[in-house]
Amino acid sequence: MNAQKGFTLIELMIVIAIIGILAAIAIPAYTDYTVRARVSEGLTAASSMKTTVSENILNAGALVAGTPSTAGSSCVGVQEISASNATTNVATATCGASSAGQIIVTMDTTKAKGANITLTPTYASGAVTWKCTTTSDKKYVPSECRG
């Protein structure tokens, strides 16, 4: 008797089906991961802005309204990101446009799903605390912005 060598057609079809199922699960998960990584870049870009705003608030002893060009505001000295100096994933990052010291980061619409992150400072008892909020899909933003 001759011993069978190699794989039968049904065995190959089963292996291909298993690979297809794994790919169907892995590709969407990887896509979500890459978007989250890009949105995290926006939070990283805002960290230097947060440091400058926190120092200004502590020096003034209060939140002071105004933009980076307004003398004495909480945003003085902040390096904003505009369309002219945007990064691959961060479209804009502004300070003080909505309220005193507030930082709004807008992500690229195609690569980072247009996520928006708003960082709002509060000053109490000599300490500055930050609250991160978003109107974007929660699965794309860092955990500290999901609450």
UniProtKB/Swiss-Prot annotation:
Q: Which GO terms describe its cellular component?
A: cell outer membrane; periplasmic space; pilus; plasma membrane
Task: Identify one Pfam family in the record.
Answer: Pilin
**GO BP term, example:** establishment of competence for transformation
Q: Which residues form a coiled coil?
A: none
One example GO MF annotation: DNA binding
Chain residues in the propeptide: 1-6
- Database matches in Gene3D superfamilies: Glycoprotein, Type 4 Pilin (3.30.700.10)
**Cell membrane found in the keyword field:** yes
Induction of this protein: by what?
A: Is maximally expressed in the late stationary growth phase (at protein and mRNA level). Minimal comP expression levels are detected in the middle of the logarithmic growth phase.
Which positions bear N-methylphenylalanine?
A: F7
Its subcellular locations are:
Cell inner membrane; Periplasm; Cell outer membrane
Q: Which UniProt keywords apply?
A: Cell inner membrane, Cell membrane, Cell outer membrane, Competence, DNA-binding, Glycoprotein, Membrane, Methylation, Periplasm
Q: What happens when the gene is disrupted?
A: A deletion of comP completely abolishes natural transformation, due to a complete lack of DNA binding and, therefore, uptake of DNA, but has no effect on piliation and on twitching motility.
Q: Which family does it belong to?
A: Belongs to the N-Me-Phe pilin family.
Name of the protein described by the UniProt record: Pilin-like competence factor ComP
Organism equals Acinetobacter baylyi (strain ATCC 33305 / BD413 / ADP1)
Name the gene.
comP
